[in-house]
Amino acid sequence: MRMSIAIPTYEVKGRGVEFLNDLFRTIEIQTFKDFEVVVSDHSKDDKLVDVVDEFQYKFDITYVKNKNDLGNGPANTNNAIRNCSGDIIKVMFQDDFFYDDEALQKIHDSFNDEHDWLVCGSNHTQDDGNNFYWDLYPRWNDSIIKGVNSISSPSVMAAKKKVFDQIKFDESLVMMMDCEIYYHIKKKFGEPIYLHDVLVSNRVHSEQISSRYNASSNSTSDLDREVQYCISKHLE
């Protein structure tokens, strides 16, 4: 089965080139080679094109300049997925990267006829990959729709194309975009494969959405509104 890696991108306050380059370098060394990369770019400038040009002869890359819904992360992620053609679609956020050079191979080999999506283990770095901490092994909990995230960011998920053909990231959400889609997919397609290998590193930095929200004086009320919306959408 051919794989697609869907990457939504933007400027990240001047660090977008650095982050995408780091991610591409971990893609280049993957042992599994039957994949494409799709970049959906919300940047107002064209600096990320230089990174794409640098790697375009190393693996198959499709670059899409997305001028719609600027600043809406779920919409940009959906656009990246929409342009994917693989049998399995692996979501990767621009500021995260693969921790294991066999990550794609392990994800590919784990898929079967009984399961339609997968979540893998992850760790975290605050110093751009010099040190790693907090290995998180995904598990389900019934409060995930209330924002109790025991899985991690969307960078740990992969799904068969038919899943994303039917279910999209909810474009009205920010902080709950991951928990909501996990709940939605499980409700329709059943349990994921829980791959308890650490395959992805989540980069912790000041410009990531969770950091910006935590620094906002309205963060609690904004999150509460999103949680109530998700409960109304799925439980009422």
Q: Can you name each region flagged by the protein language model?
A:
Residues 97, 102-132:
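Conserved donor NDP-sugar-binding/catalytic core segment of glycosyltransferases
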